Amino acid sequence: MVQKRNHFLPYSLPLIGKEEIQEVTETLESGWLSKGPKVQQFEKEFAAFVGAKHAVAVNSCTAALFLALKAKGIGPGDEVITSPLTFSSTANTIIHTGATPVFADIDENTLNIDPVKLEAAVTPRTKAVVPVHFGGQSCDMDAILAVAQNHGLFVLEDAAHAVYTTYKQRMIGSIGDATAFSFYATKNLATGEGGMLTTDDEELADKIRVLSLHGMSKAAWNRYSSNGSWYYEVESPGYKMNMFDLQAALGLHQLKRLDDMQKRREEIAGRYQTAFQQIPGLITPFVHDDGRHAWHLYVLQVDEKKAGVTRSEMITALKDEYNIGTSVHFIPVHIHPYYQKQFGYKEADFPNAMNYYKRTLSLPLYPSMSDDDVDDVIEAVRDIVKGAD
């Protein structure tokens, strides 16, 4: 049996270097802590990175999704289709506009929304689709865009997991009508909290920018800079969802080191793939050959009959016997109590999402993991399955 680690290996950790710390320190010393020049610089550099014309920095991916839907006028009486395999915030943003979330089941291989089931879910009330690039694997955007074009739907990509993902040589963030990114602490690019909305639609970007800061026509940076004016106008009853400079200071240097961080993620995922594909009863992530996987998550599925162990037993053993942390992504949205009570969803409505959920766990995957850490995870999983024989 593999020995238990002396120190707990968490499921995820951000990689923060001296450059980020120095940038944050300089920002603190500048006296500009709220939305200001760092945010504008981060927006410009992130837009260039993904190949979009516009980027609007906000305080979360959730905010980016919500503001984009609001800016498009989506509200009561409308329906928005998304995947049941996502964090609840994706569906919650739809509800907060007054619209109704409608789910279309996932493809059992890619774990992304199935375009055929998406087409079947469209009704005369459907106004938008929110495809979720699960784990860092891109959705079938050609098929999704075809459905959207046929029905006149707004395509808002949930790319919370997809910083660095590509689809057919195009960076996610430059394909749909708009794309929402997350910079939460566990994400591939981390600012603690934070998000970004990218789009080529200038009018949409302007509306989101105004909505994100109280509906004011002039941002705080413009008002308080040496070239600004005290005067502002409120164009709509907006929200307080903007990013601030301390977050952007982190983001600027996270963006600079993203290539190196992604390379390490790919190395770790590659080792996992090689090791776990040789173990009966383990189902490794599917990887498209027409794009780049961001490897935000490494989700391992456990076939109980072949592996001789359940997903839950593996999670418990990794923690208690080997001192290794895991997580589960995600509990399908439609089985949460609120959604079942409010919309009448049943567990059996989306069998592919449920089948995946019942046998999945997310293993540690982050750039600061050492080779020894990776060895420990591989050997522990191998040991657990072997011990079940």
Swiss-Prot record:
Names of required cofactors: pyridoxal 5'-phosphate
Leader sequence residues: none
Annotated InterPro entries: DegT/StrS_aminotransferase (IPR000653), PyrdxlP-dep_Trfase (IPR015424), PyrdxlP-dep_Trfase_major (IPR015421), PyrdxlP-dep_Trfase_small (IPR015422)
GO molecular function: pyridoxal phosphate binding; transaminase activity
Pathway the protein acts in: Spore coat biogenesis; spore coat polysaccharide biosynthesis
Record-listed N6-(pyridoxal phosphate)lysine modification sites: K187
UniProt record similarity statement: Belongs to the DegT/DnrJ/EryC1 family.
Protein name: Spore coat polysaccharide biosynthesis protein SpsC
Lineage, broadest ranks: Bacteria, Bacillati, Bacillota, Bacilli, Bacillales
